[in-house]
Structures are given as C-alpha cells and as structure tokens.
C-alpha cells in the first residue's frame, strides 16, 4: 500500500495437516508408521537394512510409493516410484551450507532444502517454488527420539504425503550418514 497506494489482496492460505512419523525397531530393516493427529495409522514404511530400498504401504498393504538408493554416485542419488512408475530421480546438490536435493518431475522441479530452525534439522519441500510441506525433527526429550528417527510432517498437499514420507526417511538416513563421518556438504565447508 505504501509504495503504490493500492490495497493488495491477501494471498489465500492453504490449510496444512500435521502427521507424526515414528520409527519402530525391526531386526530385518527400517520400519516406520505415519499417523494423523488422531493417532490413525495412514501408512507403514518398510525399508531394507542398510537402506537401499524403501516401500510406503497404505492400510491395505498396497505399495503406493517406493524409493531406491543408487549406489556408486559421488553425491547421494535416489530414484522414486509412484504406483510402480518412475516419478523422478532425487540428487543431492553441492551446497556449502545446507543439504539440498532436487528432482525433475512431470509437474516441474521438486526441491528438498534444509532450512534453519531453532533446534534440530528441518527441511522444506517445494514444487516449482510452491511449498508442499516441511519435515521437522521431533524434539521431545524421550528415549525413542534419542534412538530412533521421529519427525513431524507438515503437509499442504495431502496427495503428496507418500512422497514426503520417502523424503523424510531419506533425510534421516543422510543425517545419520553425516554423523558417521561420510564426506558431505557440511564436512567440505568446515
């Protein structure tokens, strides 16, 4: 208003949904559950140990999303499949400050970028600059959070929840890899 003298319309705010993302211990590999705010399990996630393949299953045990880690790449690379079809290839980008991954999909460019939060590791997921959601560490001081990867997913487009679930597991695995001393953007910048 100050610059133009014209009242600008408010941007419509899209409501978001919050989901919990909790790891369960399994000797056979990674296992996660995704629940809504009422505690209803929406998806289960099963992955191999070490994480090479990850499957997101709905309540009917149908595979709705799959992620596979591509071995032999200098920077982390993952292939994502939706309903058995290739959705895109997520590649870690060289960035001196924060983790950043991009993927070209039919809808445009998808980006997962670490952003500064007060505590913990937080990521935002955008598609062509539009916010799809965020992945935030569960910072409650519990034994489960100290041992397992637990997070909150804030989702603006519920149809993208399985994609965000895969990205949350991938981000958690990359953080664990960073802690184990792998060469990463963070170690290069020090």
Residue ranges and their predicted role:
Residues 56-89:
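Hydrophobic/aromatic-rich structural module bridging two neighboring secondary-structure elements via a short loop
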């Amino acid at each position: 208003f100050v610059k133009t003298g014209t009242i600008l319309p408010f941007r419509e705010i899209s409501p978001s949904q919050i989901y919990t993302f909790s790891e369960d211990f399994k000797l056979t590999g990674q296992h996660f559950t995704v629940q809504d705010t009422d505690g209803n399990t929406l998806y289960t996630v099963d992955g191999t140990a070490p994480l090479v393949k990850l499957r997101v299953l709905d309540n009917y045990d149908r595979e709705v999303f799959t992620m596979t880690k591509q071995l032999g790449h200098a920077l982390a690379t993952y292939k994502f499949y939706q309903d058995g079809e290739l959705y895109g290839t997520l590649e870690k980008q060289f960035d001196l400050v924060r983790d950043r991954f991009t993927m070209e999909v039919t809808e445009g460019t998808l980006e997962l970028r670490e952003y500064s939060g007060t505590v913990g590791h937080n990521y935002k997921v955008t598609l062509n600059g539009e916010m799809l959601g965020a992945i935030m560490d569960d910072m409650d001081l519990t034994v489960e959070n100290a041992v397992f990867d637990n997070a909150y997913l804030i989702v603006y487009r519920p149809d993208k929840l399985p994609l965000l679930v895969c990205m949350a597991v991938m981000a958690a695995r990359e953080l664990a890899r960073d802690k184990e001393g792998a060469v990463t953007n963070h170690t290069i910048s020090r």
